[in-house]
Amino acid sequence: MNRLIAKTGSIIVIVTVFLFAVFLMTDLVFWSYLVCLILPIGYIMMTVGFHHERKGENSSASLLGVLFAAVYAVLIMLVYYAQLTAVNLGGLNEQAAVLLDFRRGGLIFSYDLLGYGMMSLSTFFVGLTVRGKSKKDKILKYMLIIHGFFFFPCLIMPMTGIFASGMSDGETSGSGVMALVCWCVYFIPIGILSFLHFNKNDD
């Protein structure tokens, strides 16, 4: 059951990140928000699978991975549920829209980046615990650890005000879309390699 949950989580990660890239490129904003709401569920399921494998060895690092995943999930689900409800349904005044509309680059956008910063920390600590002699497991380990360094730009860039000035009109920039698509291209293999990792053995 433990590996089934982890494999299911990996599949959710693969599918949601792929669909996120597709919806970004086709400008289907509502659907891109919807899959972002689902992604944290799969990611937590996948992360708990890595933690279960440790069974005492390196369990502190894997537990940190799970805890940061939980913080990520809370932040991201609040961000995108707000987009799908309060923002999508309309009726917000200008001040509320600046704060809550993701595309305006305000507070809610900063929370989104903070959430993905927490995800980055999660992947870093999970990556430290991945064991396996196969080439695929080694690639997975280093991809998770490298992804952890995204924590720093996710944390620092919103403090510079670069997004608030560049997104004040509420329009999504082409460079922003491409950056997110590049992230998707990087993260989909993590989901695939995680599935293959969990699929090697059964409980």
PLM regions and their residue ranges:
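Hydrophobic, aromatic-enriched alpha-helical segments typical of multi-pass transmembrane helices
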Residues: 1-203
